[in-house]
C-alpha cells in the first residue's frame, strides 16, 4: 500500500476510533499504560510507595474533613428534630414509621437472597487484579490514607 505521487494511498483502510477505545479502558490503564503490567516494572519501589502514600494521605485527609462535616450536619439535624418533637412543633406517627421499617426489612431480605450482579463482580475482579499487580502502590495508599485520617 504505497503512496502514489499525489500523496494518496492505494487500497482501503479502516478508521480506528481512539476515543471509543479509550472510553472502554479502566482509569488505571490510562494512568499506567496499556497492558504495561504491574507498575513495579515502570517505577522504583520508593517511587511507588511515595505515589501511593501521598495520594492516600490526601484522600484520607479530605475524607476526614468531609466526614466530620457530614457527621456534624446529620447529628445537628437529629438534634433539631428531637428538639422540635419535644417542644411540640412536629408530631411523629410512630405506627407509620414502624410499618415503613417492616417494609424496608422485607425488601432487604428479598435482595439478600438474590445474586450479585455480574457488573459488580467484574468491577470487583478488576480492582482485585489491580491490587495484586500493584501491591506497593496499594500498600502505600492505605498507609497514607490512615495517616491522612489521623492528621
UniProtKB/Swiss-Prot annotation:
Subcellular location: Mitochondrion outer membrane; Nucleus
Annotated transmembrane regions: 43-63, 70-90, 127-147
Keyword RNA-binding: no
Membrane topology value: Multi-pass membrane protein
Expression tissues: Highly expressed in platelet (at protein level). Expressed in liver, brain, heart and muscle.
Pfam families given in the database record: FUN14 (PF04930)
InterPro entries the UniProt entry points to: FUN14
Cytoplasmic topological domain: 1-42, 91-126
Name of encoding gene: Fundc2
Keyword Glycoprotein set for record: no
Protein name per UniProt: FUN14 domain-containing protein 2
Main subcellular localisation: mitochondrion
One of the GO BP terms on file: regulation of platelet activation
Listed GO MF terms: phosphatidylinositol-3,4,5-trisphosphate binding
Sorted UniProt keywords: Membrane, Mitochondrion, Mitochondrion outer membrane, Nucleus, Phosphoprotein, Transcription, Transcription regulation, Transmembrane, Transmembrane helix
Function: Binds directly and specifically 1,2-Diacyl-sn-glycero-3-phospho-(1'-myo-inositol-3',4',5'-bisphosphate) (PIP3) leading to the recruitment of PIP3 to mitochondria and may play a role in the regulation of the platelet activation via AKT/GSK3B/cGMP signaling pathways. May act as transcription factor that regulates SREBP1 (isoform SREBP-1C) expression in order to modulate triglyceride (TG) homeostasis in hepatocytes.
Amino acid at each position: 500500500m504505497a503512496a502514489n505521487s499525489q500523496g494518496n494511498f492505494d487500497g482501503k483502510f479502516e478508521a480506528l476510533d481512539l476515543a471509543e477505545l479509550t472510553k472502554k479502558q479502566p482509569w488505571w490503564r490510562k494512568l499506567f499504560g496499556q497492558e504495561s503490567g504491574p507498575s513495579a516494572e515502570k517505577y522504583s519501589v520508593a517511587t511507588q510507595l511515595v505515589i501511593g502514600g501521598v495520594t492516600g494521605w490526601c484522600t484520607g485527609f479530605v475524607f476526614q474533613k468531609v466526614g466530620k462535616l457530614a457527621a456534624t450536619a446529620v447529628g445537628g439535624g437529629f438534634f433539631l428534630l428531637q428538639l422540635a418533637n419535644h417542644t411540640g412543633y412536629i408530631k411523629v406517627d410512630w405506627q407509620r414509621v414502624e410499618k415503613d421499617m417492616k417494609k424496608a426489612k422485607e425488601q432487604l431480605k428479598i435482595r439478600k437472597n438474590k445474586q450479585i450482579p455480574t457488573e459488580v463482580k467484574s468491577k470487583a475482579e478488576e480492582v482485585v487484579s489491580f491490587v495484586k499487580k500493584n501491591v506497593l502502590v496499594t500498600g502505600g495508599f492505605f498507609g497514607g490514607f490512615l495517616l491522612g485520617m489521623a492528621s
